[in-house]
Design a protein with these regions (language model features):
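C-terminal luminal/periplasmic domains and tails of membrane-associated envelope-modifying transferases
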Residues: 423-428, 436-665
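Polytopic membrane enzymes that build or remodel cell-surface glycoconjugates and lipids
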Residues: 1-467
Length: 665
């Protein structure tokens, strides 16, 4: 068995197989349970209602060349979330193989180090957006594939000492596709210069000749790079452009530059690898942590086995030169990759969604960390063990990130099922306002596409029937008042509405969706909530909800199977019955929930049932639920006082008043 394994590990297929295993462990285990995230959702909506060609016009104000990539890929692969998740895995495998192939041509005597770089590049822990697949495959990863392929052709021509006009033209064409489709990789073209420089060190007679030949070889690509820089800058300054503005000149302060250098290098070169250890900072024995530990072991063993069987030059001179190049080129590439986001004034953080900027940094950061390991640990078993653990931790960390995406998609689907239960249909032109929904990887504009998908499954035209807005990001405090226009440009569509035609909703963590209003779900029922949300309650008009219509037909591809009819289903139906003044129905719903052994996650969800039992004469149950609510959340005492005062004409308040005076101090 051991002999067969060793025989396999020496075959050319061993390294690609190791990459495939690592990608599966880190990114692929939860693939069937993943969905759409961030801009995936509006892109899927555009594809569903307008078709692939719409991306060309949709990207014109942002990245005019990128729309063509979206148009081609969506024509070929459609818009199913599982398809894009699988394509994401294949794309990462292709990128890992490209990096490995390219670096083998540049550093042919450093097979082992090059493989470590490919592993680190593939699992780089700071880039946590693998599962935003629809967006990032098209927006960044395909352009990066073009650029790395272009580098590989250049390196291959130099290695074979060939001058081929067709291959050079192909390399320039791929460079053009990689640079002009997105600004993310603008700075990475400098890598080609250094790769040419490194390869030519082996044959150059003297430094002057070496540098001259390097420059001449790079010249055609340099011309394209300069043209790209001029085009990018001019387009960003034109009236056609509508996105981030270039602000590099305001950042050319010496102290700012030094601070950026230290922050970027420390964050991308060191902190990102140390951050992987936080998944075991607290040993809780959870299933996620156990699986992560298994992945750590399997990924470490896989990378150790694959790398230990690679032959590597061990002469000091060769090692020393390669360490120098790895570290130097790594540092330069880190800052070249940071340049576009830095020029736009965007921060570099290991958090969603700023971590997307690491996509142009991760190759340089991988060269840097492997170069340091080679330099410090030399060709020792300690280095093999150390780097195996680094790769294993990166794989385990990425799995834990994947699990947050899985949970978030479940929460998103559940959110829309709750919306459909509570608001089967809305008047056309309605805006849903909320402070923020408890989902991490989708914002209001992305969720707005799903809202229109749900309520307008046969949508045609350019005027959106519904909108969803986060108060925290779309409004200033003084704008939260009646009769304020709401005008939204959403890619190639628009929405025209008014704050007076709004429904204000609130969902707290694991709690149920609630429609806020000045009477039943007023400010007293959301203690501690943002003043943005409190001020918006007066705008909420539940009358815009068409409660007597059938629930919308939910696209199962997007929204999944209907969530179980648990407590939140009961609560949604209770709110509808309360809105209609049908108190008997509210009490009936509670009794059915009791039989099914359902209970709320939050005490505030007892309020409609307390009022219903009080108004229908079941004071014992009303008092019992009131006491339970106070004990669970004392800050609801003002809301309970108001609730019981509302029922004055229908009930005897003596018991309730006694309880409130005793418990609400």
């Amino acid at each position: 068995m051991k002999a067969k394994l060793n025989q396999f590990l020496h075959k050319p297929i061993a390294a690609p197989a190791a990459l495939a295993i690592l990608i599966t462990l880190a990114y692929g285990i939860l693939t069937p349970q993943m969905g759409f995230y961030w801009d995936d959702l509006p892109f899927a909506w555009i594809l569903r209602f307008f078709g692939p060609a719409e991306f060309i016009e949709g990207f014109r104000p942002f990245r005019p060349m990128l729309g063509y990539i979206f148009a081609v890929t969506t024509t070929l692969f459609g818009g199913h979330p599982l398809t894009w998740q699988i394509l994401g895995l294949l794309t990462r495998l292709l990128l890992g193989l490209q990096a490995w192939s390219l670096l083998r041509k540049v550093f042919p005597t450093r097979e082992r180090s090059v493989l470590w770089v490919a592993f680190a590049f593939t699992l780089y822990p700071a880039y946590g957006q693998q599962w935003v697949a629809f967006t990032h495959i098209n927006q960044e990863l395909i352009p990066l594939i073009f650029l790395l392929f272009s580098f590989t052709i250049t390196a291959s021509l130099l290695r074979h000492k060939k001058t081929s006009l067709p291959l050079t033209a192909l390399a320039i064409f791929l460079q053009t596709l990689g640079l002009f489709s997105t600004e993310y990789f603008f700075g990475l073209e400098i890598l080609r210069f250094f790769f040419i420089l490194i390869i030519l060190t082996e044959t150059a007679a003297d430094k002057k000749e070496w540098f001259k030949k390097t420059t001449l070889t790079w010249l055609p690509y340099l011309i394209v790079w300069v043209i790209n820089a001029a085009w990018t800058y001019s387009y960003h300054q034109s009236n056609a452009y509508n996105s981030y503005q270039i602000s590099i000149f305001s950042l050319l302060n010496p102290l700012t530059l030094v601070n950026e250098f230290i922050n970027t290098l420390s964050l991308s070169g060191f902190v990102v690898w140390l951050s992987t250890f936080k998944i075991f900072s607290v040993i809780d024995g959870s299933i996620t942590q156990i699986i992560a530990l298994v992945i750590l072991l399997l990924a470490s063993l896989t990378s150790y086995a694959a790398a230990s069987n690679k032959e590597q030059e061990t002469r000091y001179e060769e090692n020393h030169a390669t360490h120098y190049w790895f570290v130097l080129v790594g540092i330069i590439t880190i800052f070249a990759g940071r340049l576009p986001s830095w020029a736009a004034g965007l921060p570099l953080k290991i958090e969603f969604d700023y971590d997307r900027f690491f996509v142009s940094i991760m190759l340089g950061a991988s060269l840097f960390i492997i170069g340091l390991a080679d330099w410090i640990l030399k060709e020792s078993r300690a280095k093999l063990v150390f780097l195996s653990l680094v790769i294993g931790m990166a794989a385990a960390y990425q799995f834990t990130v994947a699990n947050t995406y899985r949970r978030d998609w479940e929460n998103t689907q559940d959110l829309f099922w709750q919306i459909s239960w509570r608001m089967p249909l809305l008047e056309t032109g309605t805006t849903i306002l909320t402070y923020e929904f408890p989902v991490q990887y989708l914002s209001d504009y992305q969720l707005m596409s799903a809202l229109n998908w749900m309520y307008a499954p046969n949508f045609e035209g350019r005027e959106l029937p519904y909108a969803l807005q986060y108060l925290k990001t779309r409004f200033e405090a003084f704008e939260i008042k009646a009769d304020q226009p709401i005008n939204i440009t959403y890619r190639t569509t628009t929405f025209t509405g008014n704050t007076s035609q709004s429904v204000v909703v609130y969902k707290e963590g694991n709690g149920c969706l609630r429609v806020l209003d000045p009477i039943y779900n007023n400010a007293e029922t959301i203690p501690g909530a943002s003043f943005y949300l409190v001020d918006a309650i007066s705008l909420s008009n539940p009358g815009l909800i068409l409660s007597n219509t059938p629930a919308p037909e939910m696209d199962k591809t997007l929204f999944g199977e209907e969530s179980s009819h648990g407590w939140c289903y009961t609560y949604a139906k209770a709110e509808i019955a309360r809105q209609a003044g049908n108190w008997e129905e509210v009490t009936k719903l509670y009794k059915e929930a009791q039989k099914a052994e359902l209970s709320p996650s939050l005490p505030v969800e007892y309020l409609p049932f307390i009022e219903a039992f009080a108004r229908t004469g079941d004071m014992d149950t009303a008092i019992k639920l009131t006491e339970r609510t106070i004990k669970g959340q004392p800050t609801l005492c003002p809301a309970l006082h108001t609730l019981w005062n509302r029922t004055t004409s229908d009930t005897d308040l003596s018991q309730a008043e006694s309880l409130l005076q005793k418990e609400c101090k």
